[in-house]
Amino acid sequence: MEYFDMRKMSVNLWRNAAGETREICTFPPAKRDFYWRASIASIAANGEFSLFPGMERIVTLLEGGEMLLESADRFNHTLKPLQPFAFAADQVVKAKLTAGQMSMDFNIMTRLDVCKAKVRIAERTFTTFGSCGGVVFVINGAWQLGDKLLTTDQGACWFDGRHTLRLLQPQGKLLFSEINWLAGHSPDQVQ
């Protein structure tokens, strides 16, 4: 289990100067050719998503104005807060800030031939399904994960096992991504 606080994470500026990324984790850890990766991006200007052949990207708007995502003849989609949207990361996708204000989003990318991610918003106590990995990010409220208290802009990632997240207040929201291996794959094969 690895814990993080978005306010204390290192920031990588994009080459096109349209935004920045905070990498949460990758699997396998510290590998350039990852099977899955979680990150938080701040988008300050219109531009294109980086291409990642063979990957699927699920993007979830965390804050800021809505974002229009366009991919040639494939789709035009308005990204709204806390509504995950998946697309192939090997296609050119343009992002346009609809309100002209900076947006922040959560990204999970998975290798299409190895694993599959799901992203949900939780508003009550729950237990993960025992996947190959997962990431949680607190949108608001106070949540207990094991012996650790997580509050707004904090989270955790793991590479295996079942975990219970307890909401400690009457209300709270947590972004939760669970990654599952496709048939014939397991974490033991890649570490």
Swiss-Prot record:
PANTHER family: PROTEIN VES. Belongs to the Ves family. This is Protein Ves. It holds the Pfam family HutD. CDD domains: cupin_HutD_N. It comes from the Bacteria. It comes from Escherichia coli (strain 55989 / EAEC).
